[in-house]
């Protein structure tokens, strides 16, 4: 399927069925939860215009989404309400129904000429799209909009490290870093009788969703949605970016983008984000480059990882050398030793680690340099490396707003050697890289970070 404005490498046909004589073109929204810079949405509008039909957007609100809780649902619903309004301004109905995403897509897809979906990389997301492609009565087309360079275009295998993926990505950047202006819909479709939730039902949807563990929403500390993401981006471009390279490993500062949570829910486009940062030529080149390294190389390395390693959430995903060296040191004495429950309480002997855990619990976020230290100490203080892996992944997915994400799975696995190299052998860690409290004391004002978190926790409790 060709498009006038969307790169052909982003578009993938998922079944061998034809476009049929339906009533509308359906965009099944799941991963890319936005109305701007959304390649799947723009393709659906293009196709609707070509067929002389309306365009409809479907969304399934799943009551038991894998590992989701009240914190995740609240942030997502804030963004979805805004997306609904922006789509309405473009004459496009956003139809939300309770139910599994593929079932909702198939319900509305039964009257569609064509189904367009966005792309997700986790196992359940892949399985959902396969289900829709298999059961839909019409052609299903997937569009990749939550990476800059499509995963298979960047590489045809699981990459060893950032250094092996980086040159492959940079070769393709010019071809995929392109503006995506909105396509006007020729046939407005807001009055189609398709049901779905009204505004009041959407705002109350959280009460019907299974909220898993008791994890409170973060409230006003982080608001969901494209407008909030745009506000964060404006802060970055006008101020924080000028200190990004020097302060990205300084957890006591606030010179970070906070983009991870918005990228996770698809509330901002990585293409748009990259273009904005690259265009901020009033800011130092080293700071722009440091940010783009995280957004383009590290993030898309994580996408590569979960795409080519279906066991991304299993200890088996670790490189052979890491598994071997951790096995060699599995019986090393560990002191102190904490249970997963003791770690979750954030009451260890290490005040720096406790601060990181408490920040994570209070506001669903942790500075990236502290995420690394946090994970390394779980490895050091757990009964076995396998237990440590599961503890880190469980806490990560439970508390972080950007948990349950390809970057989260890659970050946890990095703690245990993924995308890294062997280091000097030492107890417990073997040849896996370690991190020490003395390193934090040497490289940053870690006690200022502890004080900052104490204030954040006090504010959260008010």
Q: Model-flagged regions — what are they?
A:
Residues 31, 95, 250-450:
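Active-site-proximal binding-pocket segments
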């Amino acid at each position: 399927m060709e498009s006038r404005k969307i790169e052909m490498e982003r578009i993938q046909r998922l079944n061998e069925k034809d476009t049929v004589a339906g009533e509308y073109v359906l965009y099944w929204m799941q991963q890319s939860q936005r109305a701007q810079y959304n390649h799947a949405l723009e393709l659906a509008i293009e196709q609707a215009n070509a067929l002389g039909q309306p365009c409809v957007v479907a969304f399934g609100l799943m009551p038991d989404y894998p590992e989701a809780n009240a914190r995740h649902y609240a942030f997502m619903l804030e963004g979805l309400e805004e997306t609904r309004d922006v789509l309405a301004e473009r004459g496009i109905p956003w139809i939300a129904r309770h139910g599994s995403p593929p079932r909702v897509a198939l319900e509305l897809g039964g009257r569609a000429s064509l189904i367009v979906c966005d792309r997700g990389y986790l196992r359940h997301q892949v399985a959902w799209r396969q289900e829709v492609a298999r059961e839909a009565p019409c052609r299903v087309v997937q569009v990749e909009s939550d990476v800059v360079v499509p995963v298979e275009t960047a590489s045809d295998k699981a990459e060893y490290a950032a250094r092996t993926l980086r040159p492959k990505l940079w070769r393709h950047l010019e071809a995929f870093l392109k503006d995506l202006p909105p396509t006007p819909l020729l046939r407005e479709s807001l009055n189609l009788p398709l049901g779905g939730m009204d505004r009041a039902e959407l705002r109350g949807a959280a009460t019907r969703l299974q909220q898993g563990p008791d994890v409170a929403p973060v409230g006003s500390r982080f608001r969901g949605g494209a407008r909030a993401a745009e506000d964060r981006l404006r802060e970055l471009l006008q101020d924080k970016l000028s200190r990004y390279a020097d302060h990205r490993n300084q957890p006591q500062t606030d010179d970070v983008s906070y983009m991870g949570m918005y990228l996770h829910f698809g509330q901002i486009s990585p293409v748009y984000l990259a273009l904005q940062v690259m265009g901020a030529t009033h800011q130092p080149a080293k700071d722009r480059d440091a940010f783009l390294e995280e957004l383009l190389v590290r993030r898309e390395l994580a996408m590569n990882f979960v795409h080519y390693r279906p066991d991304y959430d299993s200890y088996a995903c670790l490189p052979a050398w890491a598994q071997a060296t951790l096995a060699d040191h599995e019986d090393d004495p560990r002191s102190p030793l904490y249970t997963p429950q003791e770690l979750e309480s954030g009451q260890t002997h290490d005040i720096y680690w406790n601060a990181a855990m408490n920040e994570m619990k209070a506001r669903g976020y942790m500075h990236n340099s502290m995420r690394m230290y946090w994970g390394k100490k779980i490895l050091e203080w757990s009964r076995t490396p396998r237990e440590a892996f599961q503890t880190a992944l469980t806490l990560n997915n439970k508390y972080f707003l950007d948990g349950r994400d390809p970057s989260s799975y890659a970050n946890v696995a990095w703690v245990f050697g993924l995308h890294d190299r062997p280091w000097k052998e030492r107890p417990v860690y073997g040849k896996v890289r370690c991190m020490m409290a003395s390193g934090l004391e040497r490289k940053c004002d870690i006690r200022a970070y502890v004080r900052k978190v104490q204030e954040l926790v006090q504010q959260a409790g008010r």
